[in-house]
Regions:
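A short, charged, amphipathic alpha-helix used as a generic interaction element across diverse proteins
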Residues: 36-71
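Short N-terminal "domain-start" leader segments
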Residues: 1-33
Length: 72
């Protein structure tokens, strides 16, 4: 039987050192052991503007309630 770990999260658009935008996932409670000390960034397509990245992060915050990790 699989072991499922879950946590609430939120997303924020940030600009990386290379100038490209990413959406960063922040965990609320650090209850997912695999992600407790990790940073999870979602790479965006080249040419994504700051406004597009911000709107995407806002949309994700409106629709995503958490993260599930399924460990076999």
């Amino acid at each position: 039987m699989a072991n499922i770990e879950r946590d609430s999260c939120r997303f924020k658009a940030i600009q990386g050192a290379d100038g490209k935008f990413v959406v960063r996932m922040k965990m609320f409670h650090k209850t997912v052991s695999l992600l407790a000390d990790a940073t999870v960034d979602f790479e965006l397509l080249n040419g994504t503007t700051a406004d597009q990245a911000r709107k995407l992060a806002e949309s994700m915050n409106d629709r995503v309630t958490g993260v599930l990790i399924n460990k076999a």
